[in-house]
């Protein structure tokens, strides 16, 4: 079976470094657009609209992850990841999944309308917002569009040829940004957010077929490839199904206990923090996973171990510094960026920034995926969701929403009881290296305090 022709003239290290630099530039440009658009649109729309959109986004993410069988990681990790028949099998599964997700979203939209009709929710609840059912229905169409995205994008990531990926993503985001701002200015409605999301997804899907190297995708599948997809993806499916509750459980829970405006303010804090998280997650998925996978296929365990800890340096220093800095400087940053309606997001973001302490172990998850040890990723997510859904109701009962936010920030710390033993078993635990980076946290706290003192 012929493969897609991709040349690899550079060493793994050089290709990973180039990919890292490219992705950092891409994330920076993306976050500038996102933050700039966010600052403008929050002045055009009222906080309640962001609360409704937060629920719609949560529903979309939940459904995506509940049906996630790891198609992209499979393409990146598999020895068959550049074979046209294998890629067509992946694409066919992805298309079918998109239609199924859209139908499920429509059912949830009808369910939301019915619960409003019988007045199941308190009048102040986000779930009682009259726009919610239609926002859900229209936003769900993005699942169909995304389903047609070409797996040639995944091949480009697999071999570190990511320039086109970055350009396509930025073009799609820019189109969505322009649509959001123009429609927001003209209509002052939540539909500007919905339209922006749909058009951005459509643009990237079209570009994925037009600009990436490889034969045209066809709807077909190979039984052997299909078995490999589901054998690899079964633990990822469990992991994602459980992990989605950990990732989105706070908004699901707060949707019933916060007012629409409060959830809108909370979503602003989550979005700003998410901008930092996305930098690390982007590098993990687009650089670390392909690098770990290639090193793993070589069979050199010492090379894998060395690559893991070299990669950890940037992640550890960045996440620990950001954790300390935002812990002390978040209220000031929010006061600079937003008007008084969003002031409450400052203290919320300060608390949530503690989650950055454990985000640095994302690289362990990527290494487990590269080694095919997807069951450990599933176990990690099980710990997250159990911890979150124990802490949320307990802290809510003790001190209300303000206490429950601490549960969102701290629930990931329980995963360390899995990460350290597993990495020790794999010969990847070096306590000296784990400890030596911790001063970056204190340096971040110091800089945050210093800037806050200077400007308040």
Predicted features, each with a name:
Residues 44-47, 159, 186-187, 248, ...:
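Helix-loop interface residues and adjacent transmembrane-helix termini in multi-pass membrane transporters
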Residues 112-138, 317, 326-357, 402:
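Interfacial segments at transmembrane-helix termini and the short loops linking adjacent helices
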Residues 66-83, 88, 157-158, 269, ...:
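Helix-loop junctions and terminal segments of transmembrane helices
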Residues 2-3, 12-71, 102-117, 137, ...:
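Signature of the first transmembrane helix
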Residues 3, 14-31, 56, 65-120, ...:
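Membrane-water interface segments that mark the loop-to-transmembrane alpha-helix transition
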Residues 26, 30-34, 38, 56-60, ...:
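Short runs within selected transmembrane alpha-helices of multi-pass transporters and secretion channels
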Residues 2-12, 16, 121-125, 191, ...:
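Interhelical loop/hinge segments that connect adjacent transmembrane helices in multipass membrane
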């Amino acid at each position: 079976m012929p493969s897609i022709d991709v040349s690899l003239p550079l060493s793994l290290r050089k290709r990973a470094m180039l990919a890292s630099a490219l992705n950092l530039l891409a994330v920076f440009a993306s976050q500038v657009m996102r933050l700039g658009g966010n600052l403008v649109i929050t002045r055009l729309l009222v906080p309640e609209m962001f609360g409704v959109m937060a629920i719609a986004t949560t529903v979309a993410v939940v459904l995506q992850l509940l049906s996630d069988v790891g198609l992209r990681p499979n393409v990146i990790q598999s020895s068959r990841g550049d074979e046209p028949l294998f890629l067509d099998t992946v694409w066919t599964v992805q298309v079918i999944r998109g239609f199924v997700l859209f139908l499920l979203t429509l059912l949830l939209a009808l369910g939301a309308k019915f619960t409003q009709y019988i007045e199941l929710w308190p009048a102040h609840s986000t779930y009682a917002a009259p726009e919610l059912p239609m926002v859900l229905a229209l936003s769900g169409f993005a699942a169909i569009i995304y389903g047609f995205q070409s797996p040639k994008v995944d091949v480009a990531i697999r071999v570190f040829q990511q320039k086109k990926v970055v350009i396509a993503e930025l073009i799609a985001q820019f189109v969505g940004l322009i649509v959001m701002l123009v429609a927001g200015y003209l209509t002052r409605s939540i539909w500007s957010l919905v339209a922006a999301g749909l058009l951005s997804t459509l643009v990237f899907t079209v570009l994925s077929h037009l600009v990436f190297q490889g034969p045209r995708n066809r709807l077909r599948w190979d039984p052997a490839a299909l078995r490999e997809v589901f054998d690899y993806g079964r633990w990822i499916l469990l992991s994602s199904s459980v992990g989605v509750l950990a990732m989105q459980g706070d908004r699901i829970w707060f949707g019933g206990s916060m007012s629409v405006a409060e959830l809108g303010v909370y979503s602003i804090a989550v979005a700003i923090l998410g901008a930092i998280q996305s930098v690390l997650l982007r590098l993990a998925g687009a650089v670390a996973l392909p690098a770990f996978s290639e090193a793993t296929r070589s069979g050199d365990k010492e090379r894998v171990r060395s690559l893991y800890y070299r990669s950890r340096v940037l992640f550890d220093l960045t996440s620990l510094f950001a954790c300390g800095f935002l812990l002390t400087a978040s209220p000031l940053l929010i006061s600079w960026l937003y008007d008084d309606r969003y002031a409450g997001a400052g203290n919320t973001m300060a608390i949530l920034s503690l989650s950055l302490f454990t985000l640095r172990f994302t690289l362990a998850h990527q290494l487990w995926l590269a080694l095919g040890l997807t069951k450990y990723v599933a176990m990690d997510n099980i710990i997250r969701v159990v911890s979150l859904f124990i802490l949320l109701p307990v802290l809510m009962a003790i001190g209300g929403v303000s206490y429950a936010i601490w549960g969102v920030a701290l629930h990931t710390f329980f995963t360390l009881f899995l990460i350290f033993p597993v990495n020790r078993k794999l010969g990847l635990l070096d306590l000296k290296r784990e400890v030596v980076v911790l001063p970056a946290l204190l340096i971040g706290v110091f800089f945050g305090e210093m800037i806050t003192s200077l400007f308040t």
